[in-house]
């Protein structure tokens, strides 16, 4: 027999981020007690698919007319709690969790840059990022000029009217070159 618990309306935000401090938000933001079991901790949902009430409900979800989960590669309840918690901790309106840093970088670039966009990047970056800039992004019409991260003026010279992103890593991979971030930021602005 399942225990009785307090009613918690579907979709209710149990923690108002404005009322709590960082530690409390880190533990509880974005979640609510399980309405069936009363469990406090967020479970790890290992499902890939979800049940729909009817075809109208499914259509509304797929047409983005209603919030909800349709397939775990896109969203799931466990990841939704993580996203809501990060947004609360950062004071943001939302967050997007990705499967890797590479996925996050790709998502940010293709979301913010259009075809014909240009990137000026340090030549000393993670190999996966270099491959994305050199091989993948050109297929989207996005080009990259690689420059020496130790030379801020190289960044300035490489900027064109189509430049939309200046990219680098504070400690470049693999040589651990240190960028002059204040100067490069000044150039980028």
Regions found by a protein language model. Give the residues of each.
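Active-site phosphate-binding strand-loop segment of PLP-dependent enzymes
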Residues: 149-189
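Conserved PLP-anchoring active-site segment centered on the Schiff-base-forming lysine
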Residues: 111-129, 147-148
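Buried hydrophobic positions in well-ordered alpha/beta secondary-structure cores of metabolic enzymes
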Residues: 38, 86, 104, 119, ...
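A glycine-rich helix N-cap at a beta->alpha junction
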Residues: 135-136, 140-150
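Short helix-loop-beta connector
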Residues: 90-93, 113-116, 161
């Amino acid at each position: 027999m399942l225990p009785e618990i307090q009613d918690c309306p579907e979709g209710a935000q149990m923690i108002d981020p404005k009322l709590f401090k960082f530690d409390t938000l880190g533990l509880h933001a974005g979640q609510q007690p399980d309405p069936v079991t009363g469990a406090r901790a967020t479970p790890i949902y290992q499902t890939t698919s979800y049940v729909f009430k009817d075809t109208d409900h499914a259509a509304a979800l797929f047409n983005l007319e209603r919030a909800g989960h349709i397939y775990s590669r896109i969203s799931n309840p466990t990841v939704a709690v993580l996203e809501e918690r990060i947004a609360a901790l950062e004071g943001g309106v939302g967050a997007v969790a990705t499967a890797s840093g590479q996925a996050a970088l790709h998502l940010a670039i293709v979301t913010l840059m259009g075809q014909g966009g240009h990137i000026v990047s340090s030549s000393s970056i993670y190999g996966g990022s270099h491959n994305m800039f050199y091989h993948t992004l050109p297929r989207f019409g996005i080009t990259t000029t690689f420059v020496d991260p130790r030379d801020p003026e190289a960044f300035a010279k490489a900027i064109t009217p189509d430049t939309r992103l200046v990219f680098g890593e504070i400690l470049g991979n693999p040589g651990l070159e240190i960028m002059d971030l204040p100067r490069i930021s000044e150039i980028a602005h």
